[in-house]
């Protein structure tokens, strides 16, 4: 839910263990995978153009940071089960902002300048790595610098002879209260997949269920001297009071089931439907060594946000049917035809067809 392929990639410098590395001395029972990265957002022009003619906030020249660590327990040579778990986090920070709003409960609201240059020094890079510091419009209610968010992951795999299965879960969080167990983890992504023995009909089945409707509840209040109790709620996934939305060039950087700001009609760089429930189904097969196919279907309902709820939930139904042909006569060549459609009220209804040709390998020269 935190990072995916929905948005344009961010240029970044990345230090990574891309594959699991076995920890010496564990007899292949423990392995780790990790990365750390820093990058630079490249959507300055898009943000200015999208908000042009409005008083909506936008930013430019902000930085990106991500990090992750995963531990895998299991030795498939000795036992068919492996358990993988880990933490993934990311942050948008620094840059410059225009039309930024102050906190409505900040006593210095009258003197707040909506044009702000955020901190871009070494300390900000450290605050992104170890969440700390505060934002320019936090006022007296100091929080964490930048748009910090993350996900906990857990996956159990069964490695059978000629077949396999997996179940997995992901918990997304926007703050400390959901990073740990201050409130129950009601919002989750659950999934399962089965890889079948070799046959000409069906090779893989996938099911996933996503829920983001709780968000720690509908009430939020920072403690004050007169009312010292903190109430952590209204997490409003993918939203941030400085950077607007967890997006790059208009597209959500996590799951596209929380609609991207690009679809907003009023020029707001913000998620307008962060409370959703969705079911996803997928099948894949290889009728022959040259032909493959896949079918994906997703149904979702969206309730808007706690601050701007929908009276009736909007619905979306999405279908993709795709077939590929890779002839043996030309190794590396693949021809793909796809049909997709969007139905329901969440997005405009649409249908489309795509034909693609790809080649992987060296082109021989005479």
Model-predicted regions and their roles:
Residues 12, 349-366:
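Outer-membrane beta-barrel "beta-signal"
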Residues 19, 38-44, 87-93, 160, ...:
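Transmembrane beta-strands of outer-membrane beta-barrel pores
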Residues 1-103:
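Internal, well-ordered domain-core segments that constitute the primary functional module
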Residues 34-36, 83-87, 165-169, 205-207, ...:
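Membrane-embedded beta-strand positions of outer-membrane beta-barrel proteins
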Residues 20-34, 72-84, 158-164, 196-202, ...:
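Short loop/turn motifs that connect adjacent beta-strands in outer-membrane beta-barrel proteins
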Residues 216-305:
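C-terminal structural cap/anchor segments
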Residues 80-85, 92-225:
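Long, internal scaffold/assembly segments composed of regular secondary structure
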Residues 146-147, 173-182, 272-276, 289, ...:
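Solvent-exposed loop/turn segments connecting transmembrane beta-strands
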């Amino acid at each position: 839910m935190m990072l995916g392929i929905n948005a344009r990639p961010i240029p970044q410098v990345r230090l990574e263990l891309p594959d699991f590395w076995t920890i010496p001395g564990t007899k292949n029972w423990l392995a780790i995978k990790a990365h750390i990265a820093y990058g630079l957002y490249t959507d300055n022009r898009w943000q200015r153009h999208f908000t042009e003619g409005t008083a909506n906030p936008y930013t430019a020249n902000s930085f990106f940071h991500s990090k992750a660590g995963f531990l895998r327990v299991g030795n498939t040579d000795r036992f068919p089960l492996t358990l993988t778990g880990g933490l993934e986090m990311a942050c948008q920070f620094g840059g410059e902002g225009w039309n930024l709003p102050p906190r409505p409960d900040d006593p210095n609201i009258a003197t707040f300048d909506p044009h702000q240059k955020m901190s871009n020094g070494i300390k900000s890079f450290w605050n992104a790595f170890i969440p700390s510091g505060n934002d320019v419009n936090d006022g007296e209610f100091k929080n964490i610098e930048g748009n910090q968010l993350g996900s906990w992951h857990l996956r159990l795999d069964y490695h059978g002879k000629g077949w396999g299965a997996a179940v997995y879960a992901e918990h997304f969080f926007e703050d400390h209260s959901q990073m740990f167990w201050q409130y129950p983890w009601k919002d989750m992504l659950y999934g399962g997949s089965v890889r079948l023995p070799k046959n000409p009909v069906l090779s893989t089945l996938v099911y996933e269920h996503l829920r983001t409707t709780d968000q720690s509840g509908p009430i939020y209040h920072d403690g004050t001297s007169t009312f010292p109790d903190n109430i952590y709620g209204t997490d409003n996934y993918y939203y941030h009071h400085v950077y607007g939305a967890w997006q790059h060039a208009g597209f959500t950087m996590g799951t596209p089931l929380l609609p991207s700001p690009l679809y907003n009609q009023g020029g707001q760089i913000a998620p307008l439907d962060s409370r959703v429930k969705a079911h996803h189904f997928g099948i894949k097969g290889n009728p022959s060594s040259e032909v493959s196919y896949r079918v994906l279907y997703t149904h979702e309902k969206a309730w808007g946000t706690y601050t701007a709820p929908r009276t009736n939930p909007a619905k979306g139904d999405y279908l993709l049917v795709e077939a590929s042909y890779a002839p043996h006569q030309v190794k590396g060549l693949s021809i793909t035809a796809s049909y997709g459609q969007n139905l329901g009220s969440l997005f405009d209804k649409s249908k489309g067809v795509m034909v693609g040709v790809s080649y992987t390998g060296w082109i021989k020269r005479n």
